[in-house]
Structure formats: C-alpha cells, structure tokens
Amino acid sequence: MGECPFAHQANVDRKRVPAAGFGTKNSDWWPNAVKLNVLRQHQAKSDPFNAEFDYAAAFNSLDYDALKKDLTHLMTDSQDWWPADYGHYGGFFIRMSWHAAGTYRVQDGRGGGGEGQQRFAPLNSWPDNGNLDKARRLLWPIKQKYGNKISWADLLLLAGNVALESMGFKTFGFAGGRADTWEADQSTYWGGETTWLANDVRYEEGTKNGGDINDLKNRNLDHALAASHMGLIYVNPEGPNGEPDPVAAAHDIRTTFGRMAMNDEETVALIAGGHTFGKTHGAGNPDLVGPEPNGAPIEAQGFGWTSKHGSGKAGDAITSGLEVVWTSKPTEWSNLYLKYLFEFEWEHDKSPAGANQFVAKNADAIIPDPFDPSKKRRPTMLTTDLSLRYDPAYEKISRRFLENHDEFADAFARAWFQLLHRDMGPRARWLGPEVPKEILIWEDPVPTADYALVDDRDLAGLKQAIFATGVEPSKFLATAWASAASYRDSDKRGGANGARIRLAPMKDWEVNNPQQLAEVIKALEGVQQQFNSSNQGGKKISIADLIVLAGNAALEKASGLPVPFTPGRTDATQEQTEVDTFEFLKPVADGFRNYGQSTDRVCAEQILIDRANLLTLTPPELTVLIGGLRALGLNYNGSSHGVLTHRRGQLSNDFFVNLLDMSTEWKAADGGKGEVFDGVDRKSGQKKWSATRADLVFGSQAELRALAENYAQADNADKFKKDFVTAWNKVMNLDRFDVKKSNIARARF
C-alpha cells in the first residue's frame, strides 16, 4: 500500500500524524470495547457501482471461451520482469488460486476465495503469499480487457483451473459467480500473534483444555483457526515450528486441512496433485528480500518482496526460502510426485536460503533447472511431502493413488474443485458453461421446484389453515427465525431454503427448542399435506415455505402490518445434508434468542455482533431486530430476559423505552458473573426486569444506544415496526439465490 516514509522520521508514529484516520484512536483508549465496524463493511459507499451492479448478468455475457484462451496463452507468455519457471506460469497460478481459496475454514465459513480478498491486506502481504503480487499483475491485462464481466474473485481461481488444464490435467469443472468486494475484510480472526510466522497464541489457546504445547505430534490448535502459524495458509512446510519431522507435520496437516472440511483422502489428493507442478523458491539469503506489498514504499506501487539477491527473479528468486522441484516434468500432469516419494530414500538437507528440506539419497540428477537446460539437480521434497509417506493413514492412500493413476486424477479433480468452490454456497449461485452436472453433498443441495407456486389467494387460505392448527403464533415466529437466521454469509450456508431445521443435526440443537420445533413441524406438515393433496391446479407448497409463511402470518398478527412473502423454497432431504460440517453452524451462544453466555475469551455481546456480521446486518438492522424479537418474546425456552414489556407477543418499541428508562437501575444478578442482570426501581428497589449482556449492550455501547434512542422516541413507534418488518424480511430471504433480488417481495406500507 506504500507506507509514509515521514512517519518513521524523528520518532513520528501514527498517533502524531495530523491527518484523517490517524492520532490516538478509541481502540487505543478502550481496546476491549464493543466495535461495530464489521457491520459497516461492504456498503454502497465503498462500492464503485453503488451496490447496483448485477455481476451475474455481466458474467453471463462473458465470452468464456475467449477468456480461457487468453489465460492459456498467458501461461507460456513469460515476462522479463518476472520470468516463468520452465517457461510456464502454471505452477505459479496454481499456487495463487490455492492460496486464494485455501484460507477457507468450516468453523465460521470465513476465508476462502469468494470475495477476491487476496488483493487486500493482510492476505496480500502474508509471508505464505510471497510474490503472488506478481501473479496478479500478470493477470491484470486480462482483467482490464474483460472488465466487469469477470471479477477478480473469479479470475484468481479460474486462472488456476486453466493452469491445470494447460498442463494436461482434466479438471472437474468451474463455476463463476463470485462478486468482488472493494475493501479489506475486518471480520476474520486470523489469530492473536503480532509477529509473522509466530504461533504461540494459537497453541496456548488450543491447549487450555488439554494437551502439551511442546508436543508437536499431539498439540491442539485454537479451535477458531485453520493454520499453524500467523501468515500461513495451512502448515509450516519445513515442519512444525520449523522442525523437519514428517510424522509430526502430519498432525498439523490433518488438523488444518480438516478445518477446511477436507478428509485424509482429499488432503493427500490435493498435496500430491498440486505438488506435481512447479517449484518452490529459495535461491539465497532471505534477509535480502524487501518488504511485503503493504510495507513497501509508495513508488513500488504495491509490488512487494523485491530481492537484492542477484537479479531477484528467475533463478535468483526467493519466496518461501525452500528450493524444491518435485518432479522431472514440472509442467506436465503425471504420477511422478508419488513415484519419487516412494522410489527414493530421503535425507535431510538445507536450501540455499537455509530452510529445512529433503533430498533424494544417492539419486541421479534428473530434475531440470528452471532456466538453464544444461543443469540438473537431484529430486527434492518438503518435510510436509514426506508426511504422505510416513504417516500410516496418508501412506495407505498415497500408495493406492500411486498404483491407480486414474483414481488419483479423479480424487485430485474433485478435491481441487471443492477447494475452489466450498464457500460458493448453493448451486443457484454457480454460473458458466463448466458447472458440473454431478450434485455434490457439500453444496448443501436443495431440489428444484417442479410444481406451480402459490399465489396471493392461496396464501390467504394457507394462513387461515396455519392458525387453525392451534399452535401458538409465537412458536411459528420462533421456528421461522431459527430456520432463516441459521444462515451465514461467509460461505452462504444455512438459511430457510431446504428446511434443514427439520433434519439432523439442526432439529436436535438445544437452541432450537427441539420439542417445540417438532410440534410446529408436525402442524405445518399437516397443512402442507392438506394443501398439496387438494391439487390446486398443480400448485404445491414446501415445508420450507410454510415455516417462513407461518412466521410471517404470526408477525402480521403481532404488528398489524403486511409482511411480504416470496415463495419458491424447497425441502432438502437428510441424504442431501452433510451432517458433520453442518454441525459447525450450531451457535455457542445466540444473543438474538438470549441463548448461552460469554466464553472465557469472548463476551456475549461480541458473539452477537459476530453473528450479526454473518447475517449481513447493519447496526440499525441489528438494533431493530433485537428490540422486536424481545417484544415478541422469542427467547430460548421462553426466558423473560430482555423482554422489557408488559405486552409480550405484540410488536412494540417497549424494549427500547424501558431499557432507557432512568428510573431503572441495573445490577448483576448471577453472583458477580456479569451475565444476567436485574433491573430494579431506583426508589423502591423492587425488581422490574431481567436482562443479559446481549440486551444491556444497547444501552451501554454509545452507538447502539444512539440507535436505541431513535427507536424509543415517541414519534418513531411506527417507524420501529416498519423497520422491523423490513429487517425480518431480509433475514427470511438471505439465502434466496434462486430469486433475483429485484423479484423478492418487499415491505410496502
């Protein structure tokens, strides 16, 4: 980004810079204060298209074949300013794509290549992304040519796919549809270390519940993370903490790849397939490498890692510090990686940069030099490559792939496709002529509606039938919210479409009140059966639609306002649900329903903000939803915490009015734990209310209090109701990628 050189002179630091955004900040005074910045990301003001650009339409107008042809040409169009190894950029672009997508983690769905974040800090300056700025610069003429029809997010991944194809590999397919963002993501927790490649914090946190931080073969990584070091995508290729121990490295590999939702077979396929191509770079002293893009001077124009070792490029290039070429044909698809892995015995060696690696013992020099045809070298491997041989489970898979090349190719194609698309969400988002026909379970597939959808006349009758079941309206509201609010925008999983709330694992989550949920689902199944069997001109309705419709009908009753509804959701089956990874959507705590409490590291209100970010909520939307959900009484298990109203079940702004009432004093009510509070009358001392941290934050955090005051005003009672209905409708439709935004029914008052 170009650091200001003057800030380093005369002991000037950022706190002394008299310019916008500098000086001592609120976060310096109150580092643990609740921050709302993650709820203001990716807004229209930071988007040059003002959020009105239809990327799907633009992509569908793209000459896809011409783009791929240009990318294929680029692979062998070596540039003097960054020459291609072996005259082919294939391995380079594979690494770029892999590192763009490989930050994904299944725990919270964040990371991944879905937003083109590799262009921004910190990812653009991670040590593991060294010199990938050059890969993006090589792509720029193509991006410039095709413009808005191909996003950076799609291009960064498509380039890797084309790279594989240009070297003789048959890929599984490719789907476009990733719209670009225009600012660095602030929501992802990458760890607590403040030094590149450090890992003390993540393993200290990981071993709090057991394990030994010094036991490299068994240590536990922080549950929130998926990389073994700050600034790495997965693991240290030299081995755990730089120790060249392949068996210990296998433990780190299994942990980090597993947190990307990859099993052992997919992990072996990815490593063995990816390392069939290209090389690593460690030609000399790494101290001669300059600062990363974000730390480079302004004249570098975002070009980082400039090296003073020789020419700094080609045969003099230094990236990871490792100097490894895996096969004798690094620009061709082959089984040579696995062949060499088992054919040779390996001995510890050091790269010219001093990094730990391995070289084939007593082997001939059969590996070509990337720039000098007259030179050869012995086969080399990374510590983490040897894990595929010396870890018993990995070895079994690796030997099977060695003996069955077609099986290996298919496994790599599938694993690579999953790597690039895991955070794409439902197939309705997938665009382009290379979308594979095979449905994969990790897509969270939902059936296509093969029937006529209901209209307004049908909806009126269905609402009557819903209320005729005798189920309390609040239970319909609770189920609709639980279903829709399971969505997370990070990887587009969850949501109401599919009605997975009636399937394992969601149906058994404590937060969803399984007994009440079963009652609601049974009632709605009766309504569905009656309607669908009546053969209303071929019309049918799904349970997914009925869950939302029932919630909407109950909200109309509670608010007196019309609530828009867009039909078309369908019902997934248990066989279409990947239970083990869906379990990661289960909330530890949920402030929207006053469920759970703070952890030893995160306060309940911070968990609430994190959840609001995953729901793409703005601060006003978060505020109005909390106020409305409390008034409606939608707490977990019927709790009265935060229900600051004597009209429970009616949509009102009472939560804000009573929260801000200065006649009430709040006191801890849980023995000093600071999770539950009583609101008592200042004069009489009589208890009036109870609340949690997720409630009181709307009176304590200044920005949230300002919004609470807005909704508590006498002239904003109606505005509150309308804003709540609008925000409710947004959440109900967050996963409706099957419908254009312009076709989703909007609240009209």
Swiss-Prot record:
Cofactor: heme b
Crosslink site: Tryptophyl-tyrosyl-methioninium (Trp-Tyr) (with M-260): W98-Y234
Catalytic activity: H2O2 + AH2 = A + 2 H2O; 2 H2O2 = O2 + 2 H2O
InterPro entries: Catalase_peroxidase, Haem_peroxidase, Haem_peroxidase_sf, Peroxidases_AS, Peroxidases_heam-ligand_BS
Residues that coordinate or bind heme b: H275
EC number annotated for this UniProt entry: 1.11.1.21
Chain positions of site Transition state stabilizer: R95
Keyword Iron: yes
Subcellular location: Cytoplasm
Entry keyword set: Cytoplasm, Heme, Hydrogen peroxide, Iron, Metal-binding, Oxidoreductase, Peroxidase
Active-site residues (renumbered): H99
GO cellular component: cytosol
Family matches, as Pfam families: peroxidase
A single MF term (Gene Ontology): heme binding
PTM notes: Formation of the three residue Trp-Tyr-Met cross-link is important for the catalase, but not the peroxidase activity of the enzyme.
PROSITE patterns named in the record: PEROXIDASE_1, PEROXIDASE_2, PEROXIDASE_4
Crosslink site: Tryptophyl-tyrosyl-methioninium (Tyr-Met) (with W-98): Y234-M260
UniProt cross-references to Gene3D superfamilies, sorted A to Z: 1.10.520.10, Peroxidase, domain 2 (1.10.420.10)
UniProt remark on cofactor binding: Binds 1 heme b (iron(II)-protoporphyrin IX) group per monomer.
GO biological process: cellular response to hydrogen peroxide; hydrogen peroxide catabolic process
Classification via SUPFAM superfamilies: Heme-dependent peroxidases (SSF48113)
Function of the protein: Bifunctional enzyme with both catalase and broad-spectrum peroxidase activity.
HAMAP family found in the cross-reference section: Catal_peroxid
Subunit structure of this chain's protein: Homodimer or homotetramer.
Entry's family note: Belongs to the peroxidase family. Peroxidase/catalase subfamily.
Name recorded for this polypeptide: Catalase-peroxidase
Organism: Mycosarcoma maydis
Upper taxonomic lineage: Eukaryota, Fungi, Dikarya, Basidiomycota, Ustilaginomycotina
